Amino acid sequence: MGDFQPAAHTNGLLGCKIIAFICNKDLATCLAISISYIMPQKYKVYFNNEPKIITDNWEIFCADYYLIEAAGGLVYNNENQILMIFRNNKWDLPKGKLEQNENIKECAIREVQEECGVTGLSIVSFLKDTYHTYEINGKKILKRTYWFAMNTDFKGSLVPETEEGITEVVWVDKDQLAEKINNSFGNIKELLR
């Protein structure tokens, strides 16, 4: 049959972003080809704990909501356990609203400290941001949460921020995580996968 042809060429896939390697049958010569295509941005937003993908008219979609920016942490201790909170009858991760004149990393650390009583936090990396919607007194809210992986060597007592409806704060072993995830929110499940 001759030279190898990538699927994009043989199946006629137009309008895709493809980086293809075309090699002859002896694999002695390779040629890289890049085909550019502007792909639409996709946003996954959780509505009543169900994910929906928004691709078109993001600005129009957002215009119907009041945007709240927040940050939180996926916090690991020295035993590789994950910090979780129990709030509103669901297992969750510590997070909260961005305050004025605060950057997103400061917000993430402050919220973990306030909601759990944990200190000595260090940010390891940015994980992702998630979106979810809810309603308060008839006002539609779109919350964007920036998530960070964090470490701590904290060994003290965990203290739930009861004013925020948090009734329990625990360190969770990996083998207990599935049980907690079953009673959690969609965006938290996604983050912990």
Q: Over which residues does each language-model region extend?
A:
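Intrinsic disorder/low-complexity segments
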Residues: 1-34
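Acidic surface patches and DE-rich sequence motifs
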Residues: 22-23, 46-48, 77, 135-136
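A small-molecule sensor/coupling module
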Residues: 190-193
